């Protein structure tokens, strides 16, 4: 029987191997093992040799890192369709979809087949989008973008990020927007940029509250401040370099040359620093009006005062030379009155909280919220943080004294929920436009079907991170959606073996 002796257990074979391979084994041990197991001496040697081979093979170092389990993928038509949709969702062009399927799944498909399957899926997505009819219980924001020289009009919920409308239109004039917004007049507020077509459409649809976007004002403002700061630092760097060259020079002529250049650069640096400091003060004054809560009064910003302040700052910039300053001046003067439209709606949200918890307690919590929002939004120096800590602690003590610790946390959650909404613009619609641009840029031809597919996938896919993590826009809007939304497009669920 040799090594095939079935009556010798694995533990016994292991013990035989260890004793035989030991360099300190006693004389006559092989004979003793052969008598113990009733086998020949050669069988003992064979078992030890077999055990040595197993140890050498099992203890050989393998590759480093994790070892994914081997899996056999069953490729069928449904998997190819699913792959085509997912790759399209990721912004892959139709031609590249064919390449990816061939490389990843070893399945060669034609461009015509991909286009045909996507057309069917887009048609089903349009039916699914039509079937979704959530109630509009949030504010909306709108934006327009162009692809293949055609405008696409977009309506997004500011709380859920649900796309209520995404359509290809012949133009983006006021009449077109008015028709699109005609059944959205009951929304809390509508936010947009300062486009004339959008403004005319909002007026035609009789939407009561139209809020202009603060980001369209602040983005170029702080962008110019960053450019002025960069220019000032560049001149200071040249000035430092000229000082170094001056110290290394010994000849009188060269010294005079470096001195003349240094004086010229010093005048430029002084001028650019002064320009930056003056513009930074203007930008900071405009940015202070962006806050929802006035820290001095712990109430909503006084719209009349802020409007007058913005217009006065616009008049200051009007005297500055440069196209960017004229544009900023025009925006400040023309947009100021429409940048605070949100306050009427926000006041309606805060009033019930003041009734429940008391106006002074809610005012203290609003002040705390604004202090923390300012710290998250822009970096502050240590002295500024210490200075902000004093009113934060005073407001907290006041809120505890007025409401008690138990009601404090309930009121704080309500205040954070109320003030945490998107009140001041259409930046969320532009974020969705940024996602859509990835898909449109990869397609030589776009139509309404492409937009319907993007709308469906965006509304039904759950967010991976952020405050909406684990929820899709459709679920946040009150709709029931399966965990695998592609089932709604008549695409079979993924095979369990895959």
Protein language model regions, located:
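Basic, short loop/linker segments at the boundary and entry of helix-turn-helix/winged-helix-like folds
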Residues: 1-18, 40-87, 135
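Active-site proximal helix-loop segment of RNase H-like, two-metal nucleases, encompassing DDE(D)
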Residues: 231-247, 251-261, 418, 428-446, ...
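C-terminal domain-tail junction helix/linker
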Residues: 277-280, 284-295, 363-372, 376-387, ...
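Short alpha-helical "recognition helix" segments of helix-turn-helix
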Residues: 29-37, 97, 101
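Non-catalytic, alpha-helical, charged scaffold/linker segments
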Residues: 235-370
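Major-groove recognition helix of helix-turn-helix-like DNA-binding domains
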Residues: 38-54, 107-122
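Inter-helix linker motif
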Residues: 206-229
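RNase H-like nuclease fold core
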Residues: 67-96, 100-208, 227, 256-261, ...
């Amino acid at each position: 029987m040799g090594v095939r002796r079935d009556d010798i257990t694995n533990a016994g074979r292991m013990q035989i191997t260890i004793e035989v391979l030991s360099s300190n084994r006693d004389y006559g041990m092989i004979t003793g093992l052969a008598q113990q197991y009733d086998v020949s001496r050669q069988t003992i040697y064979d078992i030890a040799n077999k055990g040595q081979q197993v140890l050498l093979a099992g203890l050989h170092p393998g590759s480093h890192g994790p070892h994914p389990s081997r899996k056999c993928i069953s490729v069928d038509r449904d998997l190819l369709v699913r792959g085509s949709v997912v790759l399209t969702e990721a912004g892959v062009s139709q031609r590249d979809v064919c390449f990816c399927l061939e490389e990843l799944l070893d399945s060669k498909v034609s461009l015509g087949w991909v286009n045909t399957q996507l057309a069917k899926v887009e048609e089903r997505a349009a039916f699914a989008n039509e079937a979704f009819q959530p109630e509009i219980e949030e504010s909306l924001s709108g934006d327009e973008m162009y692809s293949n020289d055609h405008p696409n009009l977009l309506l997004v919920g500011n709380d859920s990020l649900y796309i209520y409308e995404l359509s290809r239109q012949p133009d983006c004039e006021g009449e077109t927007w008015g028709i699109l917004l005609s059944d959205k007049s009951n929304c809390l507020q509508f936010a947009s940029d300062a486009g004339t077509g959008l403004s005319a459409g909002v007026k035609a649809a009789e939407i009561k509250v139209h809020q202009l976007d603060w980001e369209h004002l602040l983005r170029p403002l702080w962008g110019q401040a960053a450019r002025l700061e960069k220019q000032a630092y560049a001149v200071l760097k040249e000035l430092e370099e000229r000082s170094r060259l001056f110290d290394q020079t010994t000849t009188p002529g060269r010294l005079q040359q470096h001195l003349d250049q240094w004086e010229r650069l010093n005048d430029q640096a002084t001028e650019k620093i002064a320009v930056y400091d003056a513009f930074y003060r203007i930008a900071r004054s405009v940015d202070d009006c962006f806050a929802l809560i006035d820290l001095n009064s712990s109430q909503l910003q006084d719209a009349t005062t802020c409007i007058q302040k913005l217009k006065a700052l616009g008049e200051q910039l009007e005297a500055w030379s440069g196209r960017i300053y004229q544009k900023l001046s025009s925006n400040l003067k023309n947009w100021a009155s429409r940048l605070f439209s949100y306050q009427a709606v926000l006041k309606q949200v805060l009033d019930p909280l003041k009734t429940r918890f008391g106006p002074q307690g809610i005012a203290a919590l609003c002040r705390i919220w604004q202090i923390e929002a300012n710290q998250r939004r822009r970096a502050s120096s240590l002295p500024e943080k210490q200075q902000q800590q004093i009113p934060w602690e005073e407001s907290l003590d006041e809120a505890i004294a007025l409401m008690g610790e138990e009601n404090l946390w309930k009121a704080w959650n309500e205040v954070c929920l109320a003030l945490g909404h998107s009140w001041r613009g259409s930046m969320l619609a532009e974020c969705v436009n940024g996602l859509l641009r990835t898909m449109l840029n990869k397609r030589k031809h776009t139509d309404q079907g492409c937009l319907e597919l993007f709308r469906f996938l965006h509304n039904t896919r759950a967010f991976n991170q952020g405050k909406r993590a684990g929820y899709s826009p459709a679920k946040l809007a009150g709709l029931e959606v399966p965990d695998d939304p592609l089932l709604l497009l008549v695409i079979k669920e993924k095979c369990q073996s895959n």
